[in-house]
Amino acid sequence: MSALISQYQNSKRSVTNMSKKISIIGGRGFTGQELIKLIDSHPQFELAQAFSSSVAGEEIIIDERKLKKTYASLDEDTEFVEEDAIILALPNNEAAKWADKISKQNSQAIILDLSADHRFDGEWHYSVPELTQTIDGNKISNPGCYATAMQLMLAPINNMIDGEVNFFGISGYS
């Protein structure tokens, strides 16, 4: 989310009192639900759409509060022309097809991919927003949990280290 804020603060577009329209593809999952909460509570963001194939048509309820919006259905005819940003909160191997469609329909929209689909794609900016102040372009690939933890841990001492740094992470759940 802070990547979107940084992008708007540092972009050529002016930041005004107007709210920025943000859609979430994958709005019903855990991450999508948290994003809906963040967007709903932010004074400059407006939830344009939350897409979910599993609960399309159902009311969006956050912390027992109804948002007066319903989850939208996502299909090949869906258009993304009014959004300022679209967040892809989809599983790996699902986000790429929607990113291409969004780029063709709305070349100005910021696309934030939370999956691994674009992490090694040179057209996408791979960024830990807390460590990156400016972003060139509108395609942002969010690092995964291990990469984020390791980069944040290393950041304060990075200038004191000579040579190569290696990290090894193990999880009991994936």
Task: For the regions a language model picked out, list residue spans one by one.
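N-terminal Rossmann-like NAD(P) cofactor-binding subdomain of oxidoreductases
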Residues: 2-174
